[in-house]
């Protein structure tokens, strides 16, 4: 196959995947700008993407582009070095700066990939992956001692940029990205034949401006995010509390509905019993059986529900201090159910006191 067997074909694949990745990086920097200018809209975008099928398809497609780009880059690098030493592209009259980036594209690519891994661990793994795996609330990442839900992207920005090393690593990654994109941007056009004396200078100029604007925005955003994280801006912003509250209300509703559904399923076999047709002994036996089933359910599922609600209440109180939890009907019902279950669990765990008979 031409795209695999020929050097030109492999360079063409590199060019096509490179174009797609440049467009993605441009989209990413614009989305980051939304987090600064309209943080509520940024959270809405994060929730929209989430673990929905279209987001998963896009993520897999993007991952495939990166893998193809990296594999072909390594392939071409080793092929070119075997044939022409360290020269990787036959290009006319390069500037010294471009010459350096051309000779070090592999090293720059490795730095960019390392930075990408850090970025994925800080964001994708804690957000979309958590949603995809349906991890329990108890294992959610913590910010200021409170759990953070996967869809609340602004809180993950604050969590990441609270770390003193984050802006340093990001800026190093952005500088490497500038060199890598600046050379890769125009060289991909050179690959498809746009390398004459008229177009090559224009493409180099476009590449430098485009890359410089994108990377400058990334660096500015990293600085702004760091300053905001140090001030706990996103976790304390009054305009975001309604959004955080809505997310916790949904969690409370889901937990309550799940508990209620399981409770109804457990008690379903006993709903249509006609105790009037039973003997006293049979009634006592059934009553004891129902009591045992209820106690087992409360001990197992009730404990799980209480633990979920403890996490929800902790997150809600930390992120929505100005909002009354009882303003949401399902949240209020869930909190009441939790309080009742806690009382029952405490009573069930308390051993009976030995009662001395009266003399």
Regions found by a protein language model. Name each.
Residues 1-359:
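Membrane-embedded alpha-helical bundles that constitute the cytochrome b-like, heme-associated redox core
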